[in-house]
Each structure stands twice: as structure tokens, then as C-alpha cells.
Design a protein with these regions (language model features):
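Short helix-loop-beta connector
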Residues: 124-131, 153, 219-220
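Short acidic-hydrophobic, aromatic-tinged amphipathic segments that line or gate anion-handling sites
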Residues: 182-192, 250
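Rossmann-fold NAD(P)-binding glycine/threonine-rich loop
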Residues: 226-283
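N-terminal ligand-binding/catalytic initiation module
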Residues: 1-110, 118, 128, 302-305, ...
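Glycine-rich Rossmann-fold phosphate-binding loop(s) that bind the pyrophosphate
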Residues: 137-138
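NAD(P)-binding Rossmann-fold cofactor-contacting core
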Residues: 151-177
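Rossmann-fold NAD(P) dinucleotide-binding segment
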Residues: 191, 195-196, 207-223, 239
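Short, well-ordered coil/turn residues at beta-beta hairpins
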Residues: 201-204, 226-227, 252, 308
Length: 356
């Protein structure tokens, strides 16, 4: 039997843990795994692209556990009443190859993305950062808001989306959340949202090179949390922002970010640091208060490895329905796979009747 975590169980775990605590604990798990970076077998995700979206497989292993995530990205899905991003994942035992956990990762991907974003910002943003602009108010927006409000101390949130319905949705959800001490300001343009912000989060979905932020909007000292660019041909920042002499860019896994991140716009000699090096103190997060820092986030398999490991742990810690599924046959003789069927001869007889 294999542990199973569905959407209802994730909702139950969030209700018991609290979303802010869940994100904080997940960020700690991600940091722990990034700090043992060299123990992981890493590779860029395997992507199958179409004209309307992408389907990806994201593997990672530390030699003891193996994890993968299946995830899609289809920006036009919302027009058909479907999610832009859906995902599930597996955590397996390397020694036997047996899966230990099958889990939903649609909700969890949003949570781990917010956890990674705020983990990076805790090192890269100025320590007195209190104002965040949130450009793109779709599926990621609430999770980013909770993470940055509770874990970075954001007190003013400025919202803008080209689709006003997305901002309507976000405002409704933030009203329900009643985040103490957070002022929410609806803006009528990217420029008005960004003006005076300490942190700018871009989380847009269009599968194209979209110039969400232009050079004249960027002031000294700001931290850019660029979340939306995550596949070839899909970026959010004008390349001149990256060319600023005071810009410092941090990525998750450089070989993947060269393909999918904002730095796909740059040549191979463009210098970046990896988040693991920043967390370990081997690379600076910010040299001074005037540097423009950029977290070029595309999402990396190690974060999903951490998320699956965390989910399995709290699944066993918290009371409630500990679901398991018969994903694998249970055999008295591991060499007799057919025995699973012969234990129920009526099935074989039914098959014989069809053949006759």
C-alpha cells in the first residue's frame, strides 16, 4: 500500500497547520535540502511543448529518496473553466524503487513556490522592506501574499492585473483572510503599483515574452521576485533590467534557468548565482542597500522533493484520514505476478468467455 494525499487531505493539513505555518515549515524544509545541494542528482526538467502549453516532468534524488512531479502549464485553460497549472507527484525509496507517496501537487506547487520566493527574499530584499507590488493576481497571488506578509513583514500590498476580474478575486479572498496589519491597494497600472515598492512580485501566465517590467520602473534597492517566466519564450522582465550595473541575479538551478528563466534573454557569459550558494553563504545575496536584486524563479525539482517529503511527514503527524491506495500488487511470491489474477478465478473465466 502506498500513502496517498489528495486535495481534501491537503486542505485538512492546511486547516490543522495554518497556511502561514505550513509555508514557513515548507520554506525551512526547502532550505535544508538546498543546503545539501551537492548530494542531489539534478537535471533540467523534461518539457514537452505545444502551441498552447507545456507538460513537464521534474525529477530529483538524494540517493536515498527519489521524487518527480508531473506538471502542466496551459495559460488559456481558464477560458474553458480549467486550471492553468495542475500537478501531482511521487516520492519513492531508491533502494527498492517502491513508491512511498502519491500526492496532489497543484495546491502544493503554489505553496512551495511562495515558500521558495519568500526564502530567497529573506536574504535578498532589504531588511526594512514593507511594501510589495503584486503584478499578476491569478492562482499564485494569495499564496505569495500570505508568505510575504507573515514571513517578510510586508504591510502594504499593491495589486495590478490586466484582467480586473483576477484582482476582484484576490481582493475577495484577502478580505476573507483578514490579514492583520496588511493594507491592500488596488492600482490601475503596473507603474502605479510598482512606484515606491520595496519588493515587486511578477506572477503572470502568458506563454510569451511579455515585458511586464521596463527599466524606467526600477529604482535602486528594489527586490524583484520574478515568478511568471518559466519556459522558453516566456519572460516578464525587459533585458535592460538585467543589464543594470547594480543588478544581482539569483537562480535556482543555472542550467535550467538558462533555458527557461529571465536569463534566457542573456548570453552564456552573463553572471548569476545559484540560490544554494546564497543560502550557504558562498555567494552574496545583496552587496548594499542600492543594489537591484532579482530572484529569477522558474521552479526546480528539488523544491518538489522537499514538498513531498514534508507532506509525507505531516500526513503521519496530523490526525485525520491517512489514506493509502493499492497502487502495487501484494504478492506472496514476488515471481508470481499472475497469481494476483489467479487468486480470483472468476475473472479468468470471464476473460475466457469473452475469448470464446
Amino acid at each position: 500500500m502506498v500513502d496517498f494525499i489528495g486535495v481534501s487531505r491537503v486542505r485538512e493539513l492546511l486547516a490543522r497547520r495554518g497556511t502561514a505555518r505550513f509555508i514557513a515549515e515548507l520554506a525551512a524544509e526547502i532550505e535544508t535540502d538546498f543546503l545539501r545541494w551537492d548530494t542531489f542528482e539534478k537535471s533540467p526538467r523534461h518539457a514537452t511543448h505545444s502551441s498552447v502549453g507545456v507538460i513537464e516532468l521534474m525529477p530529483a534524488s538524494d540517493g536515498r529518496l527519489y521524487a518527480f512531479k508531473y506538471v502542466n502549464g496551459h495559460p488559456k485553460n481558464t477560458q474553458a473553466g480549467l486550471l492553468t497549472v495542475t500537478a501531482f507527484g511521487v516520492l519513492a525509496d531508491v533502494e527498492t524503487g517502491y513508491p512511498l507517496l502519491l500526492s496532489e501537487l497543484t495546491l502544493t506547487t503554489a505553496l512551495r513556490t511562495a515558500a521558495t520566493s519568500v526564502l530567497a527574499a529573506s536574504r535578498m530584499a532589504r531588511t526594512n522592506s514593507r511594501v510589495m507590488a503584486l503584478i499578476g493576481n491569478g492562482a499564485q497571488a494569495e499564496f505569495q501574499t500570505i508568505a510575504f506578509h507573515h514571513l517578510l513583514g510586508i504591510r502594504e500590498l499593491r495589486l495590478f492585473d490586466t484582467d480586473p476580474r483576477a484582482t476582484d478575486k484576490l481582493e475577495r479572498n484577502l478580505t476573507r483572510l483578514q490579514l492583520a496589519g496588511l493594507e491592500v491597494v488596488r492600482c490601475n497600472s503596473t507603474a502605479s503599483a510598482v512606484a515606491g515598492a520595496d519588493v515587486v512580485t511578477t506572477a503572470t501566465a502568458d506563454k510569451r515574452n511579455a515585458t511586464i517590467l521596463t527599466p524606467e520602473l526600477i529604482v535602486a534597492g528594489v527586490h524583484l521576485n520574478a515568478v511568471g517566466g518559466d519556459c522558453p519564450g516566456k519572460t516578464e522582465l525587459h533585458r535592460d533590467i538585467l543589464l543594470r550595473p547594480d543588478a544581482r541575479v539569483v537562480v535556482e538551478y543555472e542550467p535550467q534557468s538558462r533555458i527557461e528563466g529571465e536569463i534566457q534573454q542573456m548570453d552564456a557569459s552573463y553572471a548569476v548565482s545559484e540560490l544554494a550558494a546564497v543560502l550557504a553563504g558562498r555567494a552574496p545575496a545583496r552587496a548594499n542597500e542600492r543594489e537591484v536584486t532579482v530572484f529569477d524563479s522558474v521552479g526546480f525539482a528539488l523544491e518538489d522533493f522537499s514538498a513531498l517529503r514534508y507532506l509525507r511527514r505531516i500526513h503521519h503527524e496530523e490526525r485525520g484520514a491517512h489514506s493509502r491506495i493499492d497502487l502495487l500488487p501484494q504478492l506472496a511470491d514476488p515471481k508470481d505476478l499472475f497469481g494476483v489474477l489467479s487468486a480470483h478465478p472468476q475473472w479468468l473465466l470471464a476473460a475466457a468467455d469473452v475469448a470464446a
